[in-house]
UniProtKB/Swiss-Prot annotation:
(3S)-3-hydroxy-3-methylglutaryl-CoA binds at residues 29-30, 113, 154, 204, 237, 246, 269, 299. The active site is at 81 (proton donor/acceptor), 113 (acyl-thioester intermediate), 237 (proton donor/acceptor). The keyword Acyltransferase applies. Transmembrane segments: none annotated. This is Hydroxymethylglutaryl-CoA synthase. It catalyses: acetoacetyl-CoA + acetyl-CoA + H2O = (3S)-3-hydroxy-3-methylglutaryl-CoA + CoA + H(+). It comes from Methanosarcina acetivorans (strain ATCC 35395 / DSM 2834 / JCM 12185 / C2A). The keyword Acyltransferase applies. Pathway: Metabolic intermediate biosynthesis; (R)-mevalonate biosynthesis; (R)-mevalonate from acetyl-CoA: step 2/3.
Amino acid sequence: MTIGIVSYGAYVPRYRIKIEEIARLWGDDAEALKNGLMVYEKSVPDVDEDAATIAVEAARYAMARSGVDPSRIGAVYTGSESHPYAVKPTSTIVAQAIGATPEMTAADFEFACKAGTAAVQACMGLVGSGMIDLGLAIGADVSQGAPSDALEYTAAAGGVACLIGRKESELAAIIEDTYSFTTDTPDFWRREGMPYPEHGGRFTGEPGYFKHVTNGAKGLLEKLGTKPEDYDYAVFHQPNGKFPSKAAKILGFTKAQITPGLVVPKIGNTYSGSCLMGIAATLDQAKPGDRIFATAFGSGAGSDAFSITVTDRIEEIRNRAPKVSELIKDPVYIDYARYARHKGKIRLA
């Protein structure tokens, strides 16, 4: 059975803070940070934006592109590590907002930055089994980094929704196959009640990101019998600009393959939306017949790899909602004081 992406929608808040502004406050070397991270600014949510509102915006854009009746959606799954409620699903909020309730199922997913792709896989399973007609998978975050922590330079806000289906006439992209690689690796964590996550810093790269991304990618390539040169585009999880570039080089993908989907330099790491944002940016410009190789990563740790082929229908739906490039342009820059207010970093005892 053929399963794939019927539609997709992305959302990025319009506010930005430059690396120089954060570095100025903490006395850090902005140029060294920009060169090391390959990130120059990051998105910031408005004071009334959270993972739920971002998920709703992305879902609405996905529905606008699709043109399908929302009552056909049998499942809404939202992946995030910044759900606004500890007990109250984000996914029910989204489902109600797009008119998909009540004859459907919903749940929230968590797996650090790959919760969104985990939701995609769950929807693929339900759609493929025939249990549901369409499934909506979302990755959305308003990620947090403690003041002066290295994460503060990249932790951003944004989200992507993917409508998963099986009717070939409706598919804008076919998901040929998927492969996951998972271990128990404590590279990044946040306990209940902690306002900010903790991490192993520079020592998390090899045992966390690179081990899982390369093994997940190699696993799918071997499963399909394909090679990097068989793909027109490649997308890897983007905690910064340096890691996906290095992963691509290790695996044999070229800079030309990853550049179209590499959005982290302009918006930062959108966590659960990161890999999906790269896929969305790539779908915004891919041609029918193009192949996309994508690998998401989530700390804790695991990776989800996907092989995707774009269909003729992409030309029909692409311009029905804003492209990622359109969401990124014309940002409103703010200083650290306003950033702290937007991010809720100013707390009264």
